[in-house]
Design a protein with these regions (language model features):
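Short, flexible helix/strand-to-coil boundary loops that buttress conserved ligand/catalytic motifs
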Residues: 63
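Short, conserved SAM-binding/catalytic segment
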Residues: 66
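A short, polar/proline- and glycine-enriched secondary-structure boundary/capping micro-motif
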Residues: 17, 60, 71-73
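Extracellular/luminal beta-rich ligand-recognition
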Residues: 49
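Conserved short beta-strand edge segments in small beta-sheet-based binding/regulatory domains
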Residues: 69-80
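Short S/T/G/P-rich N-terminal loop/turn motif that feeds into the first structured element of a domain
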Residues: 1-46, 54-58, 78-91
Length: 91
């Protein structure tokens, strides 16, 4: 399973449309895309979210469901233990 750090920039810095859509429709994630956790800035204009999937296309499908209220940045990430193992031979 691949992990993705998703940075959600709420359109016009406005969290209301985002939370209304979430309240009314839920996360809108397709089957096979799993929500891990998220953190929202105190200013309520940005969310940092970790998602997991084997199929990157599912992430794009989920992003399309939020079109109009959120601008996305997607970064593939690995856990710290895996990063340490990956860099160890070069130390």
């Amino acid at each position: 399973m691949a992990l993705y750090m998703v940075v959600e920039n709420f359109r016009n810095g406005d969290a209301l449309p985002v939370y209304r859509r979430f309240r009314d429709h839920g996360r809108l994630a397709p089957e096979g895309l799993s929500y891990i956790s998220s953190w929202v800035t105190e200013s309520l204009d940005r969310c940092y979210q970790v998602m997991e999937t084997e199929n990157r296309a599912l992430l794009d499908q989920w992003i399309a469901n939020w079109n109009g209220v959120v601008d996305f940045e997607v970064h593939p990430v690995i856990v710290s233990k895996e990063a340490a193992e990956k860099i160890a031979p070069r130390l």
